[in-house]
């Protein structure tokens, strides 16, 4: 048999933006490959299906958050909200008929490498309707982990939050359908956190909520891109969209111009650079121009370098926190009482609802066992100091790839380019395994160590060496991952 025609089976975990991309790439480029994607949710979308808190959206301009093979002239806004992005992903799946490879309502409970067979055994649990869950197994030659890092909510460790407080407790990543404007308009709400989800939730609730208490521990760099300022994201007109449809070159030029602006900030992320000094001065002054209250300006002023944490568009947030029905407290919440929250300042503030805008567990560790060669469990391997080869492969995990792994090359800007690079790399290995009849392949530990040593040396010259509570974080050892 011609090795190029060797049949392979690939299992991808997740049908978010990475899984959909993988489905498209394998369909287009990999003949004689059987591909199945397992998804715990009822449909595609991942983050953009699950996150529906007020004003949930992308902090990258819409036309820079688009697959290269599926430009979208119909983006409604410069920065799109979660439903807009889900509609785009849904359309991509329909146009390219990608759902035929996907199995929904099915969670992965464990993955185990079989050395003798050169295959992964994938254990699954399917939930359909009100029936009992069905457990079953699948097998594959290549396993692709595409479940991302923004799907496992990180709850704050606050005494009394879940067992003493008598009101409603919400995490932004699991926003309930029955808590909308008609419910919160009579509520006093505490919002904990100052990351992206808080920066979007606060202006989403402020106009109609009775009162907001916003608790901030960490300062914020508020960003802006030319062409979109003010309290609302710019909307594309019907004329804009008609022009993009008639003139694809104009659509591509618009997308490239946006990407040039986003990527043009790269020089500012080197410590001591002219770009860092100019960027810091510009955005600090812009924030000062928009926030008139000196206490708010000082409390939100970051103690870390511009770019260390992901830069977030924040004009609506800066406007909202200056309204009469909002109080900002620059203190952590240290405990909860039956009626409210107690800050580090010792003051109890009575509230009806607590919103935890505290992000996700971004430790890279999978939620289920992934057990590779010699019984090595990836959860344990990444417990102390996660590392990988190129952010996508791991020693002792044969025939395994992951999207958005440790030392993955993105902190600010769009993820689409790096995701595209990972998907193409996986396709190259699928073809190599077919053409050379490879039973297994895995990165060497010494080469992985060399790569990670290079990363740590490079990071010393950038803003990411700062301690800024970023999702690109310092592990328990002093290494950035």
UniProtKB/Swiss-Prot annotation:
Superkingdom per UniProt: Eukaryota
EC numbers for this chain: 1.14.13.-
Cofactor(s) this protein cannot do without: FAD
Amino acids binding NADP(+): 57-59, 194-200, 217-218
Pfam (any one): FMO-like
Keywords: FAD, Flavoprotein, Monooxygenase, NADP, Oxidoreductase
Residues annotated for FAD binding in this entry: 47-50, 59-60, 65
Annotated GO MF terms: flavin adenine dinucleotide binding; N,N-dimethylaniline monooxygenase activity; NADP binding
UniProt-listed InterPro entries: FAD-bind_Monooxygenase_sf, FAD/NAD-bd_sf, Flavin_mOase-like
Signal peptide boundaries: none
Keyword Oxidoreductase tagged: yes
Known pathway: Mycotoxin biosynthesis; aflatoxin biosynthesis
Transmembrane segments: none
Positions of the record's site feature: Transition state stabilizer: 310
Cofactor comment: Binds 1 FAD per subunit.
One GO term (biological process): aflatoxin biosynthetic process
Family: Belongs to the FAD-binding monooxygenase family.
Function comment: FAD-binding monooxygenase; part of the gene cluster that mediates the biosynthesis of aflatoxins, a group of polyketide-derived furanocoumarins, and part of the most toxic and carcinogenic compounds among the known mycotoxins. The four major aflatoxins produced by A.parasiticus are aflatoxin B1 (AFB1), aflatoxin B2 (AFB2), aflatoxin G1 (AFG1) and aflatoxin G2 (AFG2). The role of the FAD-binding monooxygenase aflW in aflatoxin biosynthesis has still to be characterized.
Protein name listed in UniProt: FAD-binding monooxygenase aflW
Organism lineage: Eukaryota, Fungi, Dikarya, Ascomycota, Pezizomycotina
């Amino acid at each position: 048999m011609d090795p190029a025609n060797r049949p392979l089976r690939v299992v991808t975990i997740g049908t978010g933006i990475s899984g959909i991309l993988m489905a498209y790439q394998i369909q287009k480029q990999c003949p004689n490959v059987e591909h199945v994607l397992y998804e715990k949710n009822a449909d595609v979308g991942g983050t953009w299906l699950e996150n529906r808190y007020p004003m949930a959206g992308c902090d990258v301009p819409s036309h820079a958050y688009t697959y290269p093979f599926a430009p979208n002239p119909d983006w409604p806004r410069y920065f799109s909200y979660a439903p807009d992005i889900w509609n785009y992903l849904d359309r991509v799946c329909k146009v390219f008929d990608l759902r035929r490879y996907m199995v929904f309502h099915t969670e992965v409970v464990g993955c185990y490498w079989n050395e003798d067979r050169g295959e992964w055994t994938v254990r699954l649990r399917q939930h359909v309707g009100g029936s009992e869950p069905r457990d079953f197994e699948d097998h594959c030659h290549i396993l692709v982990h595409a479940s991302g890092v923004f799907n496992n909510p990180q709850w704050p460790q606050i005494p009394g939050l879940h067992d003493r407080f008598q009101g409603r407790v919400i995490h932004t990543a699991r926003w309930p359908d029955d808590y909308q404007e008609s419910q919160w308009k009579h509520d006093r709400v505490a919002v904990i956190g100052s990351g992206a989800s808080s920066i979007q939730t606060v202006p989403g609730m402020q106009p109609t909520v009775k009162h907001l208490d916003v608790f901030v521990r960490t300062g914020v760099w508020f960003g802006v891109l030319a062409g979109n300022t003010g309290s609302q994201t710019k909307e594309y007109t019907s004329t804009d969209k008609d022009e993009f449809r008639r003139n694809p070159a104009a659509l591509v030029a618009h997308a490239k111009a946006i990407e040039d602006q986003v990527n043009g900030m790269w020089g500012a992320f080197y410590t001591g650079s002219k770009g860092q000094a100019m960027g810091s001065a510009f955005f600090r002054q812009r924030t000062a121009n928009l926030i008139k209250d000196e206490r708010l300006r000082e409390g939100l002023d970051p103690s870390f370098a511009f770019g260390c944490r992901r830069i977030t568009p924040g004009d609506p947030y800066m406007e909202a926190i200056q309204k009469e029905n909002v109080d900002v407290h620059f203190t952590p919440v240290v405990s909860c009482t039956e009626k409210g929250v107690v800050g580090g300042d010792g003051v109890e503030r009575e509230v009806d609802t607590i919103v935890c805008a505290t992000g996700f567990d971004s430790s890279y560790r999978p939620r289920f066992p992934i057990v590779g060669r010699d019984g090595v469990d990836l959860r344990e391997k990444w417990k102390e100091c996660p590392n990988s080869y190129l952010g996508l492969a791991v020693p002792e995990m044969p025939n395994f790839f992951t999207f958005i792994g440790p030392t993955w090359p993105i902190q600010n800007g769009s993820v689409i380019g790096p995701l595209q690079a990972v998907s193409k790399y996986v396709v190259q290995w699928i073809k190599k395994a077919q053409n050379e009849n490879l039973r297994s392949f895995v990165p060497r530990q010494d080469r992985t160590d060399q790569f990670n040593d290079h990363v740590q040396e490079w990071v010393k010259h950038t803003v990411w060496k700062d301690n800024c509570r970023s999702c690109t974080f310092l592990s328990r050892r002093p290494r950035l991952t």
